[in-house]
Amino acid sequence: MKNVKFIKKSESVIGLWLPILVILILFAFLVAESVIMKDIILSNSVVALATAIMASAALVTILVSNRQVQLMARQQRLKAIEDRLEKFYIPLIKAFSSYVYTAQTEDEIETIITCRRYLAGNNLLRVLPMHFKFKADKIAGSANWTFYAKEDFEQWKEALDVLWEEFLEVLKEYYTLSGTEISLPEKPDWLIGYK
């Protein structure tokens, strides 16, 4: 039992060589049928037929493999876009456009800004602050996020506008890759202020 090696499906002989085996069996069937019917086939034409069958089989295999690689690359790209949307853009947009404020919201924003910056686009990285400095204003009907300095407020206002533009670009790319009809949301009002 110590030397038992478990074979993955992709490594199995049948899974790997099945298309080639099918083509060889079809070729053998064609040759056998020709011999049984006592057709006169010159050895050159058998070689030419075998070469043509193998070439067409190789072409079909290449086309199918290429299509599978394209589909896998598309799925990987869709997954990367979903991660960008779900882990970066959507949480930040919700945090700055929702009246819902919890004690964890500030920590979530700080975590997104510091730890998930790699998910942001280049334009946003140029204007996105390294940390989230604000003063929580809990007065009903006022903005959730009130900034101490006017410079911070202006920087965040610009960063949120760039965030929204990049979000729309990423969302359009996602819709295009997934083949879904493009339906873009309206830009929210940013709940930020300056005192």
From Swiss-Prot:
Keywords: Cell membrane, Membrane, Transmembrane, Transmembrane helix. It is found in: Cell membrane. InterPro entries: AF_0924. GO terms for cellular component: plasma membrane. The chain crosses the membrane at residues 13-32, 42-64. It is a multi-pass membrane protein. This is Uncharacterized protein AF_0924. The lineage of its organism: Archaea, Methanobacteriati, Methanobacteriota, Archaeoglobi, Archaeoglobales.
